[in-house]
């Protein structure tokens, strides 16, 4: 069914080309007053549905403005609006997009609700600060390497309590290896005190000490910014219910980069309708918070878990042309990247079935494919818990390996039957031979 009042906006950094029903486009600027004029013009024309390309971040101000005005706004992938070769202009793109939208050929991409977008902005900014702080630690390590100080070879991390205590003392002027080693935690001194003392003997060049001082100041600066982000994130989260449903005590350790928000696990469970997503393997409180910041709490917009995993870029692609079949690799969005990072934490797990699944697949297909497959399983469980309310029950590595063994045995029996043979247990065969 045709919609002659469907509009399309070709978004740019300086101009917005708007066409209604495929008619000659009108051009608007991108300053705030021009965006208000664009909105008023669309409303005066009787437009109720607007589509636009996701061009960088330029579409976000207009999207929020039109959404607040009550219009149906669709953010579409630029691949859907490609014009015929030789007709690439902003005016033509706007008309062609409006024609496609008028015929119902443009599929809306996922855009979270306004409150989730606000949380998303804070979380992404915080992640940028965490990455910048990590680069400061690398600069500290570089300064130590230039001074031939091998502290990072004998302690776990320069950003830990002991590492930072030593760095601050060096910046303050302390040079004695014994005095610096005394600042380390008692566990380190008890196990490898002499190794730490030897690692702290080096050359104290002024330029390298200046690099260390600057890196430490930058580290402290980013820690303050991260703490500011934590306060903003806590402010946009819903208030904590004083009488929440009881949650079983979690034995999972909190990550070093996790936000410092009081009772975050209970708040997340409250947001998700009482579902504790941290029961899923590899999903920490911070991981669940990041996922909610990307996809929100209503995952029913994806009809099935296959739709959700495909949107996240975790489903295997396919491209058939005649007799040729080939997989199509496409980039994973932030949600898919989060699931892949979480999957990596299960690689060395000793008692989780999904860890055994990863190792079995990695031995046969390689680590990259195994990581993607494991991430897809995690994404599927995330969808099922959020939409269907399923409870994840860990079956354990031993039971999983037993299921794999039985599956292999059934496959061998089928193969033996096809070849006209019969499988005989090893103990029975030995007895018959004797």
Label every model-predicted segment.
Residues 1-434:
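A detector of single, family-specific signature residues
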